[in-house]
C-alpha cells in the first residue's frame, strides 16, 4: 500500500450504519498495512453525530490510539457536558489524537444557527486541560471549503487561540505546541521531531524574542531549515521614518 495514512469521513455516508462500516474498514486497512489513521470525524454541528465514540472504541480495543487522529470533531463542541466528559476519560485511555482546523471550522459551522451562534470548534481547551493531544491545522488551501486558506500556521494559531479562549499566561507558553510538537505526535514522528541533539535539523526561525511576542505579532518566518540546509532566509523588516524636529543647524 503506497499511502502513508488511511482516512475516512463517516458523517458523509448516507446512513449511520454505512458510516460505522467505514470506520471498521479504515481500521482494518490500517492494521493490515501498519499505517496511520486520520478520520474527518463529525465535521458537523449535529450533536447526534458521534462517530468519534466508535472510532475511539475500536482503536482503544486494538491499542492503536497513538497512531490515530480524529480531525475536526466539531459536533463534540455541541455535545452536552455529561457525554463530553465521559468521552474524554475514554480518549485519555486510548491516547487518540485530535486536530482542529480553526479557520475552516469557524467558517463552515454554525450556518444553520441564528443566535446564539456556535463557534464550530471542538473542545480544544478541555482537551489541553485533560492532557489529550490536540493540534491545530489547515486542510483547505484556496479551495471551495475555505477560499482564504494559505497555509500560514501563525494565522491558524492566532484564530485558534481566540476561538478556543486559551490566552492565559500559562496557556500562551503552551500555545505554540498546537502547531509544532502536538502535530508531530499526530503524525507519529515525535521521536524524530524537535531541537534535541541527534535529531535532524528541521526548523523555522520566527522574528521575535518570546512565545508571547511571536504569537501576538503573528511573527513572519525569517528562515526555514531542512536537514541543516537553508530552504530560504530573509532579513527582518526594517522601517525608516523621517522626523522633523524643527531644529535648524
Regions of interest found by a model, annotated:
Residues 99-101:
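Oxyanion-binding "anion nests"
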Residues 16, 78, 108, 170, ...:
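Glycine/Thr-rich phosphate-binding loops of Rossmann-like dinucleotide-binding domains
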Residues 14-15, 45-47, 106-108, 143-145, ...:
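Short secondary-structure capping/turn micro-motifs that flank functional sites
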Amino acid at each position: 500500500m503506497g499511502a502513508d495514512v488511511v482516512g475516512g469521513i463517516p458523517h458523509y455516508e448516507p446512513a449511520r450504519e454505512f458510516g460505522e462500516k467505514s470506520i471498521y474498514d479504515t481500521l482494518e486497512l490500517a492494521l493490515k498495512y501498519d499505517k496511520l489513521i486520520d478520520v474527518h470525524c463529525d465535521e458537523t454541528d449535529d450533536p447526534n453525530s458521534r462517530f468519534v465514540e466508535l472510532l475511539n472504541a475500536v482503536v482503544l480495543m486494538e491499542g492503536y490510539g497513538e497512531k490515530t487522529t480524529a480531525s475536526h470533531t466539531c459536533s463534540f463542541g455541541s455535545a452536552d457536558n455529561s457525554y463530553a466528559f465521559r468521552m474524554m476519560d475514554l480518549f485519555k485511555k486510548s491516547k487518540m489524537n485530535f486536530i482542529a482546523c480553526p479557520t475552516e471550522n469557524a467558517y463552515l459551522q454554525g450556518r444553520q444557527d441564528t443566535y446564539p451562534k456556535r463557534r464550530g470548534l471542538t473542545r480544544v481547551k478541555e482537551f489541553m486541560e485533560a492532557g489529550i493531544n490536540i493540534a491545530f491545522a489547515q486542510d483547505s488551501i484556496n479551495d471551495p471549503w475555505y477560499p482564504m486558506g494559505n497555509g500560514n500556521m501563525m494565522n491558524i494559531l492566532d484564530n485558534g487561540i481566540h476561538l478556543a479562549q486559551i490566552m492565559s499566561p500559562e496557556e500562551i507558553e503552551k500555545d505554540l505546541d498546537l502547531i509544532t510538537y502536538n502535530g508531530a505526535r499526530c503524525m507519529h514522528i515525535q521521536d524524530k521531531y524537535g531541537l534535541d541533539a541527534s535529531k535532524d535539523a528541521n526548523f523555522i526561525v520566527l522574528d521575535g524574542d518570546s512565545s508571547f511576542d511571536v504569537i501576538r505579532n503573528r511573527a513572519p518566518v525569517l528562515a526555514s531549515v531542512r536537514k541543516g540546509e537553508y530552504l530560504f532566509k530573509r532579513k527582518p523588516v526594517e522601517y525608516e521614518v523621517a522626523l522633523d524636529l524643527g531644529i535648524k543647524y
